[in-house]
């Protein structure tokens, strides 16, 4: 008797090729349900609908299709237990040798803006997880596949083992099945419970050479079943990404996501920007960002919000860089970058979308917070000094504020001409960060803008900035001594704007 395969998938990637090989090369019979059966039929493949096999029609608008003893009996039967085989024979149930199933796209659904509870609930799969768990449990006697990435390996197993997948492969596939259902149920529980329950699930994408330091083991995990963010990036050249590369790439992505309307470039070292700039072209933006701190840019991570062209590629090859990421990279640019073969060059079409929540572990638990993604243009800024801003000053203040948001606290950023001139990051007091940023800016601080991620507890930052030639300041406000800083700004002829929003970053 021909072997029997049950196929019921939401993600139909690779389905037809797999099914054709099963039928033509290994003489499987196919049973399937719903849209999967229709896809197989449309491809000209012989398939029996589950409803015809079980004798029970799909009901409740498709909510009940595979929940039937002829399905689950065929999956769960132990081929080495005589009573199980007798039960199959008495109930006219064929043993199922292969189950190919993946689940309704629940996580993709709840990620959509404005999705309703009713829409989310309809994407909670019932029959799929039941089949996935049952077939994973019975891996001693059948194979379960829940990811299109497994299909080719499974076919190779059949070819190398006289048409039967090895026990080692079946057990590995079963583990993947249980991990898949565990992640799926966790996503549902987290969604329905709101803040009461938070579960973080991931599948190891690759082992990393090490973590932040060589003595720290590390790995890269993918959340969800569909590649998004960095798991969807395409590496065009270069060595494997390291833990630190990925951390810095994400820091770069967060900055570049602030700027969509104008070509923008940022260069990151240890998660802080050493240069960020806007310009009319992407090559000009990169040149400005690089020249903002050419010393620190050596060995940096570059993110661009426009495709890499030949001119930009030529500039990128003039110094040592760890990684470059952009939405795309044309063929001529790739040829130029290939001369620096060790540079990791990635393309990621969507550099704007990041995680909505951030997780940090502490002893005995973990902390969860919403991402700091409040849009700068939705904040009601307040001009608190006698001097009022020009349109160009407002644009510069906004640029400085957006960059400062992504600098480790205490953070001070000095900018001019939509380019960072000095970045003071991570100091234990604000005046210390101010002095670092102003020292980097040097004479270019005259007439420039200063942004702070937190309020000024004293007027010393204002006075230090004025002494260096700063013309305008943007900061959250909220100090009991705000008036001291406002008074100093008026006294010294500075413009000051309060945003009312703090951007600490630890």
Swiss-Prot record:
Coiled-coil ranges (or none): none
CDD domains membership: IMPCH
Keyword field contains Transferase: yes
Record bears the keyword Hydrolase: yes
Single GO biological process annotation from the record: 'de novo' IMP biosynthetic process
Pathway per the UniProt entry: Purine metabolism; IMP biosynthesis via de novo pathway; 5-formamido-1-(5-phospho-D-ribosyl)imidazole-4-carboxamide from 5-amino-1-(5-phospho-D-ribosyl)imidazole-4-carboxamide (10-formyl THF route): step 1/1; Purine metabolism; IMP biosynthesis via de novo pathway; IMP from 5-formamido-1-(5-phospho-D-ribosyl)imidazole-4-carboxamide: step 1/1
Alphabetical keyword list: Hydrolase, Multifunctional enzyme, Purine biosynthesis, Transferase
InterPro entries, alphabetized: AICAR_Tfase_dup_dom_sf, Cytidine_deaminase-like, MGS-like_dom, MGS-like_dom_sf, PurH-like
Recorded GO CC terms: cytosol
EC number assigned by the record: 2.1.2.3, 3.5.4.10
GO molecular function: IMP cyclohydrolase activity; phosphoribosylaminoimidazolecarboxamide formyltransferase activity
Gene3D superfamilies documented for this protein: 3.40.140.20, Methylglyoxal synthase-like domain (3.40.50.1380)
Reactions that this protein is recorded to catalyse: (6R)-10-formyltetrahydrofolate + 5-amino-1-(5-phospho-beta-D-ribosyl)imidazole-4-carboxamide = 5-formamido-1-(5-phospho-D-ribosyl)imidazole-4-carboxamide + (6S)-5,6,7,8-tetrahydrofolate; IMP + H2O = 5-formamido-1-(5-phospho-D-ribosyl)imidazole-4-carboxamide
Every MGS-like domain range: 1-146
Pfam families: AICARFT_IMPCHas, MGS
The family this protein is said to belong to: Belongs to the PurH family.
Domain comment, as recorded: The IMP cyclohydrolase activity resides in the N-terminal region.
HAMAP family in the cross-refs: PurH
Protein name according to UniProt: Bifunctional purine biosynthesis protein PurH
Organism: Trichormus variabilis (strain ATCC 29413 / PCC 7937)
Encoding gene, per UniProt annotation: purH
């Amino acid at each position: 008797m021909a072997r029997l395969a049950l196929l019921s998938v939401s993600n139909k990637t690779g389905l037809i090729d797999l099914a054709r090989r099963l039928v033509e090369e290994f003489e499987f019979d196919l049973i399937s349900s719903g849209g999967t059966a229709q896809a197989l039929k449309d491809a000209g493949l012989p398939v029996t609908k589950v409803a015809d096999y079980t004798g029970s029609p799909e009901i409740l608008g498709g909510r009940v299709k595979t929940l039937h003893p002829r399905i689950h009996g065929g999956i769960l039967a132990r081929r080495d237990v005589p009573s199980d085989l007798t039960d199959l024979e008495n109930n006219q149930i064929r043993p199922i040798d292969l189950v190919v199933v993946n689940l309704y796209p629940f996580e993709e659904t709840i990620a959509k803006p404005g999705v309703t509870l009713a829409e989310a609930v309809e994407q909670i799969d019932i029959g799929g997880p039941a089949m996935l768990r049952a077939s994973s449990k019975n891996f001693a006697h059948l194979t379960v596949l829940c990811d299109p990435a497994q299909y080719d390996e499974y076919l190779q197993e059949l070819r190398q083992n006289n048409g039967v997948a090895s026990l080692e492969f079946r057990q590995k596939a079963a583990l993947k099945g249980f991990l898949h259902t565990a992640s799926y149920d966790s996503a549902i529980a987290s969604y329905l419970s709101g803040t009461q329950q938070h579960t973080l699930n991931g599948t190891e994408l690759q082992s990393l050479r090490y973590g932040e330091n060589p003595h720290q083991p590390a790995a890269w995990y993918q959340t969800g079943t569909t590649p998004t963010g960095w798991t969807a990036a395409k590496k065009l050249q270069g060595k494997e990404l390291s833990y630190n590369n990925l951390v810095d790439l994400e820091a770069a992505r967060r900055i570049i996501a602030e700027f969509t309307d104008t070509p923008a470039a940022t260069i990151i070292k240890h998660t802080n920007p050493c240069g960020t700039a806007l310009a009319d072209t992407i090559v000009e933006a990169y040149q400005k960002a690089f020249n903002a701190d050419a010393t620190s840019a050596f060995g940096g991570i570059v993110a661009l919000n426009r495709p890499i062209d030949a001119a930009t590629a030529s500039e990128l090859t003039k110094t040592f860089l760890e990684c470059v990421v952009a939405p795309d990279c044309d063929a001529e640019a790739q040829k130029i970058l290939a001369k620096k073969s060790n540079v990791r060059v990635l393309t990621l079409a969507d550099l704007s979308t990041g995680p909505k929540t951030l997780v940090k572990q502490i002893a005995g638990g973990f902390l969860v917070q919403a991402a700091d993604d409040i849009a700068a243009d939705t904040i009601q800024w307040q001009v608190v000094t006698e001097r009022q801003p020009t349109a160009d000053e407002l644009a510069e203040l906004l640029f400085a504020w957006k960059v400062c948001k992504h600098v480790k606290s205490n953070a001070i950023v000095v900018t001019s001409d939509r380019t960072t001139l000095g970045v003071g990051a991570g100091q234990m007091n604000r005046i210390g960060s101010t002095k670092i940023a102003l020292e980097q800016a040097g004479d270019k601080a005259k007439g420039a803008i200063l942004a702070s991620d937190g309020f000024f507890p004293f007027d010393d930052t204002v006075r230090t900035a004025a002494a260096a030639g700063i013309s305008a300041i943007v900061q959250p406000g909220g100090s009991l001594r705000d008036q001291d800083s406002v008074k100093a700004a008026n006294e010294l002829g500075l413009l000051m704007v309060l945003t009312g929003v703090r951007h600490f970053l630890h």
